[in-house]
Amino acid sequence: MAVEKFETALKKLEDVVKKLEGGELSLEESLKAFEEGVKFSAFCSKKLNEAERRVETLVKQRDGSFVTKPFEGEE
């Protein structure tokens, strides 16, 4: 799988899902598409986790200055 961009992988994952939902694939084709989809899903998940680690929040201090802190998302 030579995907470098999140958006590309997400589009390919959406295409795989549409194929699987269409019900037109043989069992073997469905299994192959499913395996491909799992790879795209893992890639997207990895990229989202990397992005989340890079996000920071801007916090205003009492003196009016600003500092950045790591983003603490919902978990």
From Swiss-Prot:
Keyword Hydrolase applies: yes
GO cellular component, one term: exodeoxyribonuclease VII complex
Molecular function GO terms recorded: exodeoxyribonuclease VII activity
E.C. code: 3.1.11.6
Primary location group: cytoplasm
Signal peptide range in chain numbering: none
Domain of life of the native organism: Bacteria
Gene3D superfamilies: Exonuclease VII, small subunit (1.10.287.1040)
Catalyzed chemical reaction(s): Exonucleolytic cleavage in either 5'- to 3'- or 3'- to 5'-direction to yield nucleoside 5'-phosphates
Key words of the record: Cytoplasm, Exonuclease, Hydrolase, Nuclease
Localisation: Cytoplasm
Class of this enzyme: hydrolase
GO aspect biological process, one term: DNA catabolic process
Stretches assigned to coiled coil: none
SUPFAM superfamilies xrefs: XseB-like (SSF116842)
Keyword check for Cytoplasm: yes
Protein task: Bidirectionally degrades single-stranded DNA into large acid-insoluble oligonucleotides, which are then degraded further into small acid-soluble oligonucleotides.
Oligomeric form and interacting partners: Heterooligomer composed of large and small subunits.
HAMAP family named in the record: Exonuc_7_S
Family classification: Belongs to the XseB family.
Name used for this protein in its record: Exodeoxyribonuclease 7 small subunit
Species whose genome carries this gene: Geobacter sp. (strain M21)
Gene designation: xseB
